[in-house]
């Protein structure tokens, strides 16, 4: 799984599930909502919540 995600001019390169978790945390720190993060990453809100609870 290789994915390039662009949010507000910043590019994130995702190659694994761990990368998705890291990007989700980064976006949450920047103040994005769970729904916005899910849309940006192309995953469900439920999965984003799981990512954010994992650390």
Swiss-Prot record:
Domain of life: Viruses
Gene3D superfamilies named in the record: Homeodomain-like
Name under which the protein is recorded: Uncharacterized protein 56
